[in-house]
Amino acid sequence: MCVSRLALLLGLLLCVGAQLSFAQHWSHGWYPGGKRELDSFGTSEISEEIKLCEAGECSYLRPQRRSILRNILLDALARELQKRK
């Protein structure tokens, strides 16, 4: 009997604690999953230098990445972003 009351009390405490906690915070303009409302960006001006870098013709040298793992992760992220466009 004591074990069942303890289990019930712990379950109730868990439910109340989950409702009262602020486990997830969404910043203004962001939605769950990291999505952002596209209309909030408006028409942004992109400089010519950025356009050239996207085409692969950067006017400046990029610093070399030190870590191979970081390089692989950044390249994979860049490919995923290109797929979504």
UniProtKB/Swiss-Prot annotation:
The keyword Nucleus does not apply. It comes from the Eukaryota. Its main location: secreted. The modification Pyrrolidone carboxylic acid is found at Q24. The keyword Secreted applies. It is found in: Secreted. The modification Glycine amide is found at G33. PROSITE patterns: GNRH. One of its GO terms (molecular function) is gonadotropin hormone-releasing hormone activity. Expressed in only one cell group in the mesencephalon. InterPro entries: GnRH, Gonadoliberin. Residues 1-23 form the signal peptide. GO terms for cellular component: extracellular space. Pfam families: GnRH. Keywords: Amidation, Cleavage on pair of basic residues, Hormone, Pyrrolidone carboxylic acid, Secreted, Signal. Stimulates the secretion of gonadotropins. Belongs to the GnRH family. This is Progonadoliberin-2. The gene is gnrh2.
